[in-house]
Swiss-Prot record:
The protein's Enzyme Commission number: 2.7.14.1
Phosphagen kinase C-terminal domain residues: 21-244
Gene3D superfamilies, sorted: Glutamine synthetase/guanido kinase, catalytic domain
Family named by the database record: Belongs to the ATP:guanido phosphotransferase family.
Protein name: Protein-arginine kinase
One annotated Gene Ontology cellular component of this protein: extracellular space
Induction conditions: Up-regulated by heavy metals such as Cu(2+) and Cd(2+), but Zn(2+) and Co(2+) have no effect. Forms part of an operon with ctsR, mcsA and clpC, which is repressed by CtsR.
Disruption phenotype: Hypersensitivity to heavy metal stress, temperature stress, osmotic pressure stress and oxidative stress. Deletion of mcsB also results in sensitivity to variations in pH and lowered expression of the clpC operon under adverse extracellular conditions. Additionally, virulence traits such as hemolytic activity, proteolysis, biofilm formation, and evasion from peritoneal fluid killing are substantially reduced in cells lacking this gene. Interestingly, mutant cells also show a significant reduction in expression of virulence determinants hla and saeS.
GO molecular function, one term: kinase activity
Binding locations of ATP: 24-28, 82, 115, 166-170, 197-202
Amino acid sequence: MTHNIHDNISQWMKSNEETPIVMSSRIRLARNLENHVHPLMYATENDGFRVINEVQDALPNFELMRLDQMDQQSKMKMVAKHLISPELIKQPAAAVLVNDDESLSVMINEEDHIRIQAMGTDTTLQALYNQASSIDDELDRSLDISYDEQLGYLTTCPTNIGTGMRASVMLHLPGLSIMKRMTRIAQTINRFGYTIRGIYGEGSQVYGHTYQVSNQLTLGKSELEIIETLTEVVNQIIHEEKQIRQKLDTYNQLETQDRVFRSLGILQNCRMITMEEASYRLSEVKLGIDLNYIELQNFKFNELMVAIQSPFLLDEEDDKSVKEKRADILREHIK
């Protein structure tokens, strides 16, 4: 069976050329409505559905997906595509609004009433902020958004009060991971109000040496200041990753090549493989491509990291396990 991984990928994720380190960027704005209790305090589901209806009416050009009308697998696919958070699934009255290419999504009734997301692979944080801000303006025209003149936007979590903005950049950092530098980097940037998390944010697991770098606090800084400082932090991490890769290539070339080609051999020949192992093998092959050790036709690290996740492997009506199907996809697309 041929597996068309493009069918499982949001349009914004598809790219002809992948960069060595930056995978994607995201801007998220948290907003709440006046005269409504916060989602975690709803007395009944109807409280949540009223908010869903109000937000949907304010954004008529977006497609509404109510989570109570979806099965668990469909919800998990949306998590894998970063359209919703794992936390949204836990809410009894939750929904998401998405645009055509799924680069913009509006989560309704997560921790806050509204969470606007703008995502892109080759788009600057400033451009993504402009897109998210445009949606925010559209909502503000018809909804009463909670705002305090001194504090800024009022949110459920105190760390989001102020701009209500979280800016984040997804980075592929195999060099720093292999050399065990990530703990030091995380401690350093934490002192400046920034954090490093797993692929799906707070509390999530790290897969394939992939990390999300984002701001922690939003109070007392403008959106532009947050974006500028995060960009500086990300650029410094990228600089260190490049230095480590150069050292691996110069002083540990044989060991690094052995690591790369072992992973390539496993991916091209495996018959069963877990998500965790597959992600790290893919990461090492990507490192080998970036260091010009190997050349593969149409190798798409970002797309494969989504396509091999369990929710996308449960559709096919056969008796194969998820591990077998994952191995089939990898052998088919890594040649």
